[in-house]
Amino acid sequence: MESQQLHQNPHSLHGSAYASVTSKEVSSNQDPLAVSASNLPEFDRDSTKVNSQQETTPGTSAVPENHHHVSPQPASVPPPQNGQYQQHGMMTPNKAMASNWAHYQQPSMMTCSHYQTSPAYYQPDPHYPLPQYIPPLSTSSPDPIDSQDQHSEVPQAKTKVRNNVLPPHTLTSEENFYTWVKFYIRFLKNSNLGDIIPNDQGEIKRQMTYEEHAYIYNTFQAFAPFHLLPTWVKQILEINYADILTVLCKSVSKMQTNNQELKDWIALANLEYDGSTSADTFEITVSTIIQRLKENNINVSDRLACQLILKGLSGDFKYLRNQYRTKTNMKLSQLFAEIQLIYDENKIMNLNKPSQYKQHSEYKNVSRTSPNTTNTKVTTRNYHRTNSSKPRAAKAHNIATSSKFSRVNNDHINESTVSSQYLSDDNELSLRPATERI
């Protein structure tokens, strides 16, 4: 009878035997993993089912599933949301363990030994969509490291949660990366994260928390697909795929370089020279602008540079426009040499003009200086005084006496006229009346 029952229902016998054996082993060994499946969390139960269905061996395939025993298998890890980052080889497991970040995992799965991440940022469900545009948390961290750094120079997170932040647009091409970075930085500032973004010198006002780091990584990965990033950004992320702040810092520096290129072009197009400064200074200024553009892979030909310089010449240098108007092979060095020649000629002429004026003024001073005086600064207008020159009082006295004497002379003239008439009657002679010499 027993043999017939064994042939009729062999699976039930093996199942009961397996159950009895496992139950004895559990009771004897007191395996901590031998707990009831009903006591496991829901997500552990799901992960166990997935692993039990995928990983089956020939020895256990014929044995029915035992709900009283759970084998110690690792939990399944969900793949990252953005597959492009994984396909391009982000970070090896050894580097990930060394940097204390999980390998290819979502920010919610990143390991942090001293920090308990708040469940408000992520859910334990692996199918939970990331990122959720939740503002970075600013709660105080129970991390003892944070308590030690309370008096450090870089303060910790003290921001407030800011809701309803408009997310940035998605990057569409590699050429628009710098424009996208501007919007992404504005998005972080609107999320109260402006104080953890490095400035132009690479300095930050405070250290970011774990949640803020995860939030930045999460949003950057969501809105900037890996295959649309520039090559230098990919190189940084291949070394450390979570180092987003370095990418932002270098992006800002490169944007400033682009702004400098624009400023150099504007300065080169608006060149002006009239000889007020030295020709050497003008040449150094123009050469520096051209060299800076060349370092940024922008070559300025000699013909273009000469045309821009000639356009801004004025004064004595303006005639060079007509000289170079018909030239096809313009050399920048030759143009600088001719500008230097004109500048030197004008300088010599300006030096000679003051010397001639100085000699002329000295001649005038000598002609107006008295030869008897020792002080050359004391000049007299008429240093050759004639003997007939008299003071004003003497002149006034002479005028008064001359007027008085004129009346006497008039009387005498009248008398002499009468006498002359008498003589003319007698002798027919006319004599000149006698006058006194003054």
Curated annotation (Swiss-Prot):
| Region named Disordered | 1-88, 364-397, 419-438
Q: Where is the composition biased (Polar residues)?
A: 1-11, 19-39, 49-60
Query: Which Pfam families does the entry link to?
Result: TYA
Biased composition, class Low complexity, residue ranges: 369-381
Main localization, broad class: cytoplasm
**Extra remark beyond the main annotation:** Retrotransposons are mobile genetic entities that are able to replicate via an RNA intermediate and a reverse transcription step. In contrast to retroviruses, retrotransposons are non-infectious, lack an envelope and remain intracellular. Ty2 retrotransposons belong to the copia elements (pseudoviridae).
Query: What does the protein in this record do?
Result: Capsid protein (CA) is the structural component of the virus-like particle (VLP), forming the shell that encapsulates the retrotransposons dimeric RNA genome. The particles are assembled from trimer-clustered units and there are holes in the capsid shells that allow for the diffusion of macromolecules. CA also has nucleocapsid-like chaperone activity, promoting primer tRNA(i)-Met annealing to the multipartite primer-binding site (PBS), dimerization of Ty2 RNA and initiation of reverse transcription.
Q: What is known of its domains?
A: The C-terminal RNA-binding region of CA is sufficient for all its nucleocapsid-like chaperone activities.
Subunit details = Homotrimer.
Stated name of the protein: Transposon Ty2-B Gag polyprotein
Q: Which organism is it from?
A: Saccharomyces cerevisiae (strain ATCC 204508 / S288c)
The uppermost taxa in this organism's lineage are:
Eukaryota, Fungi, Dikarya, Ascomycota, Saccharomycotina
